[in-house]
Amino acid sequence: MGNPESMLLTASRREVLRWGLACGAAGALGPAARALAQQDVAGRDALPGPKLEGLARHPAMFWEKLPDRKVKCTLCPRECEVADVERGYCGVRENQGGEYQTLVYGALCSGNVDPIEKKPLFHYLPGTTAFSIATAGCNIECKFCQNWEISQFRPEQVESTLVTPAQLVRACAGRACPTIAYTYSEPVIFYEYMHDAAALARQQGIGSVMISNGYIQEQPLRQLCRQLTGVKIDFKAFSETFYAQWCSGHLKPVLATLETLKEIGIWTELVVLIIPTLNDSPQEIKAMSKWVVEHLGPDVPLHFTRFHPTYRVTNLPRTPVETLERCRQIALDAGVRYVYAGNVPTHPGENTYCHACRQELIRRVGFQVADNRIRDGKCPRCGAAIPGIWSQEQALAFRPRA
């Protein structure tokens, strides 16, 4: 097989993941390969069903008819106006004769059984697994995307497997996963499949979490949350300039999504990938943290994760641990109760501590839970209620409050 560390210079991400499996664990790899193993990168190991030939067409939701057989997509803030036989910005929704279609209904290009901590979700069924899936496509373009091989390509350019919602739910149940995670690329762009699969999964006692950039309109978000049991939002930065220059998007729609999630009452965690010199200034982190406390409350977990050079941002170094520690302290000082330093295995900032007495409650080693002292959602030392989803019954009992 050769030396994975030296071969990494020319290898694809998928090959690196295969080396990790062949070696038995990420710990058997060199530093560069371990860096990839610490991120929520895509693979195909768990996909059932046949290889897809062509496109997986299905009627799209959330669009309006316009004159001359044009359509207007109302799923995400881009509100693309699409001419006949053209596609929206995401590349996976197409106008056919004045009827809008999704091209990726069940066209899964990634499928893995992951620790829920890999999403990362730290206050949602810790120590359990999530059947994690994705299709090709995205509705923004982050120049630092770790899954760019699937998110920045059209579906016909990516090898996919056709998996119906029923097949997905059966595969998840067969692996004893309590949760399906819609992740890796951007689940908003495969909304119809996620919606239907999550509804079916809930009927079978399986939860669903969306790992998203938050670029979605209010009406589809509210409808989707009737089926979901949790959400993680990748909060790129607290800067309109950053969103415009580095993600081809805008900050305001993401803030609106976060406020809507707060109104709905669904369990939500936030992740900020800290990129040196781009979104790591103390002033920005302080402003972001204050906004979180004022608009979402102090109990929303906030993860600051380590950047590794990838895609179009290879000229910057990986994030210094000291920067993550500084960001974490700024957020704690601003009143966020649960703040994490991510992608730094064995760092104490990856553990969960009681906000009231500072007792260590969950100790993590990488994506594994080494110790969980939370009992019935409470701190065993002082009895403080710890915000989160601590049982499958609690997850499935969620219903939107607004």
Locate predicted features:
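Short cysteine-rich clusters marking metal-coordination/redox-active sites
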Residues: C73, C142, C354, C379-C382
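Conserved AdoMet/S-adenosylmethionine-binding subsite of the radical SAM
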Residues: L162-E322, C327
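Short metal-binding segments enriched for Cys and/or His
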Residues: A384-L396
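Short linker/helix segments within small regulatory modules
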Residues: F367-I374
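N-terminal secretory signal peptides and thylakoid transit peptides that target proteins
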Residues: G2-G24
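N-terminal [4Fe-4S]-dependent radical SAM core
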Residues: M7-L9, D45-K72, R78-A134, E149-Q152, ...
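Conserved Radical SAM active-site core
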Residues: N95-G230, A397-A402
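A broadly conserved sequence feature marking short terminus-proximal activation segments
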Residues: L17-K65, G88-S110, W291-H355
